[in-house]
From Swiss-Prot:
It comes from Diaporthe leptostromiformis (Lupinosis disease fungus). Residues 1-58, 629-654 are annotated as: Disordered. The lineage of its organism: Eukaryota, Fungi, Dikarya, Ascomycota, Pezizomycotina. NCBIfam families: OPT_sfam. This is Oligopeptide transporter phomP2. One of its GO terms (molecular function) is oligopeptide transmembrane transporter activity. Its main location: membrane. Glycans are attached at residues 33, 36, 386, 398, 749. It is found in: Membrane. Residues 23-36 have a biased composition (Low complexity). PANTHER family: ISP4 LIKE PROTEIN (PTHR22601). Residues 44-58 have a biased composition (Basic and acidic residues). The gene is phomP2. Belongs to the oligopeptide OPT transporter family. The chain crosses the membrane at residues 105-125, 177-197, 210-230, 268-288, 315-335, 345-365, 415-435, 478-498, 505-525, 585-605, 665-685, 697-717, 728-748, 781-801. It is a multi-pass membrane protein.
Amino acid sequence: MEADPKVPFTDEMNIQDEHNWESGSWSSSRRSNDSNVTLLSRRSSVEQHEDERQKDSDTLFEHGDAALDAQGIADPRLKDYPIPLVAQTVHLRNDDSEPILTFRVWLLSTFWVLAGCSISTVYYFKPFSVRLSGYVVQLCTWKMGQLLASALPTRPFTVLGRRWTLNPGRWSAKEHALVVIAYWGSSYTAYGLGPLSAMELFYGKRLSSPWAITFLVTTQLTGYGLVGLYRHILVRPPSMYYPGILPTVSLFNAMHGDPRQTASSLRVFMAIASAAFVYQWLPSFVFPLLSSLPLLCWVGRGSWEAFVLGSGSLGFGLMDFSLDWNYVAFLSPLFTPLWANANRFVGAALAVWITYPVAYFSDALGSLRFPPMSSETFDTSGGLYNVSRIMTPSLELNQTALELYSTPRWSFSYAMHFFWGFASASAMVTYAVLFHGRTILKALANVWSLDGNTADDIDSEKDPYVKLTSHHARVPQAWYALLLAVCLCLGTIQLYAGDMQLPWWGLQLVVAISALFTLPCGMLFATANVQIGMDYVSEVLAGALFPGRPVAVLTATVYGRQVLEQCLNLASDLKLGFYMKIPEWELLVAQVYGTLLGPFVNWAVMRLIIDTQGAAALLGREGGDGKRQGLGLGQGGGGGGGGGGQQQRAAGAHTTEWNALKTKNFFSSSVIWGVMGPARVFGGGDGSPSSSSPYRWLLPSGFAVGAAAVLLLWLIHKARPAWRVQQWPLHPAIIFHGASLFPVFPTTNLTSSMAAAVASMGVMRRWHPRWFARWNYLLGAGLDCGAQLVQMVLGVAFLVFNRHGQQMVRMPHWWGNDAVAVDQCFPPPDLPSVIMSPM
């Protein structure tokens, strides 16, 4: 989107624009020169007009579907808004008298951050993950806020000359949104906890509490400082609308609107959430066969080829469907634009159902020695890679042992996972440079010259949502720059105080590269609900820059990933605050508070677990004979991870003994990328056997293919402007990203999730826009809320009752949860044993 010269707002211009919007025109009008009308009379006219329009708006909402136009938009002022999904969901009502940062906000934010961080950290050291769902927190906070509004005293106090009260009145939507945003700031365990636990449990380096917390805080907050640089591109323009937050806005509207208008919406949401909660017990616990219905495997029963092609847990998942919402929700099908999911589906289908089967059955890269869809790391004989065989007692690389043993090997699908990851990162950056480079440079050039209290984008000047909040004070650029500088200074000091092996220039370089990736990734995230990130690039870059320094690699990887992700998290939350009409200052305070409080809880809970349980229990180093067990590289040990928890849940076999799987994966990653290094993994010239690595082509060809695909698209755009290439629903970066999702996640996710996307964002949105506008997001939020609540209940039940080898909470085995093959895809007698369990 090209930026035009900025025109400052005036009262007169606002008035004329209001009338322009009332007539449905998406164009900027100029000031009237009529000197016969005073500014006061104009304001009176506008206020009277606003009252009438508010009454009209209330009438529209009272009549439900009858008030929606053909596109599902209730407010005529928004009929030409550039993003119809926003116009259908976000209303134009704002009450500046509503309290925002109240005592209730601080109280509930603190409660939920403490509860959420404690639960997520406990399960960080369990074999399966449980966290408080954002929708559950949103629902509970709604009722808790109403309870506080009725119970707290309303008597005002005066402190330091400032008048305040514990209870300013009605529980408002803005307060509610700030509590949820503060919780989001720490809803997941801080990513830096992985390296800290790996350093202590494997490398014997225990950081003191002040420096450990400093590490966690700086990795979480550094990215926030970049938001000031990018908010004019990633937050203000209407086109940057963040599809994933619209369901949250829809739920806020249902909870805080006029009960006469929203009662039916709330009833529908509660009915859907309740039904989902009841149903989800079937695939999650009682009848897990519903999680995976491998039709091809059933039809071809007895054939090992059909087993490999059709199994969704061990094979390629062709014709595998799921009736488990946890799998169906994989692509966020009710929230993500259909064109984005179509790109991901095309990439995944080409990789999983065509490329991988052909390569596997032709034994490419020795595929037949490994499971077809495994994300584990193996040795050349096909067994799980044993890191302890190549490490000295001081946890350094034993080069002789490495040459006698093996360099890492992967299944063909997991090797291609890295190829697609490199290609998606390259394509993402190339696309932003070629198609949006001029706009980006112009916006960045004006960052420091923009007035923090005025609209900063020509489209923002025409945006009716901006006009509702144009009088709110904006956070100056200098405050974001100060936050960034403080985090970098503290982070640099912590590197040396904590002996993190990373030099000061390494931190600055990693943050700079992450900042460069943030903008193209953010543009994709804000429009397509797809976040590519820096997972692949940061690991390879850190390993290449700091070979032989595993702790430095872990540290650099965390900063590289978190700076980008946290910047986009705050940008997304700023957009949510914009939709909820929350001033930027108040939102930033709430977000930083939640993010700042979380690391203290993460570290305290981790210390309690490690000090009480010990390393042996957490790492499973003691076998039944009391001997130390060798450490193999588990799922995702080479840099990926995930998906295994869903398979374990579907099988209904939960063990709750302590098991620091995530910590093991961080250690394994530090060995592969830090101790051995990318040169050995992808082939190098050091004279070792790894110089002939079968993966030496992955990195250069991945980056080249990604850039070449976008370059070809750009050349077509230049050669044939009439074809309007930029309007094609085709994005190479998203296609490659879709291919990279597997085998990290089970292929059971793919078919059913795409079918739900077509039904919602395709059929219902196009052919039933009124139904879509009113119910789609509430349907998705209700299904997510109910399904996630079941996982929370099961997780807590397993934690409390299934301890010390006891299985008090378990479903008796029956036909619907077979102990051998929960999906009834039984392995045939001639199935190669390596597919079921590596040696």
